[in-house]
Amino acid sequence: MEALLESRSGLWAGGPAPGQFYRIPPTPGSSVDPVSALYGSPITRTQNPMVTGTSVLGLKFEGGVVIAADMLGSYGSLARFRNISRIMRVNNSTMLGASGDYADFQYLKQVLGQMVIDEELLGDGHSYSPKAIHSWLTRAMYSRRSKMNPLWNTMVIGGYADGESFLGYVDMLGVAYEAPSLATGYGAYLAQPLLREVLEKQPVLSQTEARELVERCMRVLYYRDARSYNRFQIATVTEKGVEIEGPLSAETNWDIAHMISGFE
């Protein structure tokens, strides 16, 4: 009888026992914190982003799209990293700018880069279109959000394919839409009204006009957004491909600064 009981208990070695809590061990490939798994602690998730980037601006023009983002990585309110790029070239027809957590942006860059390599290895003459990248990002962001482990980013995707300009938005919840002008972060309050004001009067802009407007908005953001910086990149996509310029800086004028008081 004792031998029978021992043989039965051996089937559950390391498994659940009557009157005790049992934590199901993680499966291979599951995203469980090793420390949490070892000590039976709750699964942890990112509650707040650490190093963050502020606004990204996007604007369509006749024959392409322009995107701009500054090069500051803020650690809370500290201007910690002042020479980081928040714009990436995805392929010859697509570019992407991201605000929010910089580590999550680096992760997405790695994933997208590998996707593009895998597509090119097929050698079938096809590549991801801007709309395809935008659609994939909506699914990826919504998937992570549904697992209660979101990527803390808001992204602007710009591209030019089949004779059409594309400008799309995706946030950390998977919310997505397309628009002639886009702005994330503080730029949604300060820069987007300036972009829309011009587009309402002149719906189709030239490349030069679009660039001048974006540079003006970057200057306004530097004046008014405490998390912005006067060093930025401007990326342009046309039928010729993607071109990223920078670091650039805007001319500023602080002559009236001594007249502003009462906001201390």
UniProtKB/Swiss-Prot annotation:
Keywords: Acetylation, Cytoplasm, Nucleus, Phosphoprotein, Proteasome. It is found in: Cytoplasm; Nucleus. The keyword Nucleus applies. The modification N-acetylmethionine is found at residue 1. GO terms for cellular component: ciliary basal body; cytosol; mitochondrion; nucleoplasm; nucleus; proteasome core complex; proteasome core complex, beta-subunit complex. Its main location: cytoplasm. It comes from the Eukaryota. Residues 1-45 form a propeptide. CDD domains: proteasome_beta_type_4. Pfam families: Proteasome (PF00227). The modification Phosphotyrosine is found at residue 102. GO terms for biological process: proteasome-mediated ubiquitin-dependent protein catabolic process. InterPro entries: Ntn_hydrolases_N, Proteasome_beta4, Proteasome_bsu_CS, Proteasome_sua/b, Proteasome_suB-type. Belongs to the peptidase T1B family. The 26S proteasome consists of a 20S proteasome core and two 19S regulatory subunits. The 20S proteasome core is a barrel-shaped complex made of 28 subunits that are arranged in four stacked rings. The two outer rings are each formed by seven alpha subunits, and the two inner rings are formed by seven beta subunits. The proteolytic activity is exerted by three beta-subunits PSMB5, PSMB6 and PSMB7. Forms a ternary complex with SMAD1 and OAZ1 before PSMB4 is incorporated into the 20S proteasome. Interacts with PRPF19. Non-catalytic component of the 20S core proteasome complex involved in the proteolytic degradation of most intracellular proteins. This complex plays numerous essential roles within the cell by associating with different regulatory particles. Associated with two 19S regulatory particles, forms the 26S proteasome and thus participates in the ATP-dependent degradation of ubiquitinated proteins. This is Proteasome subunit beta type-4. It comes from Bos taurus (Bovine).
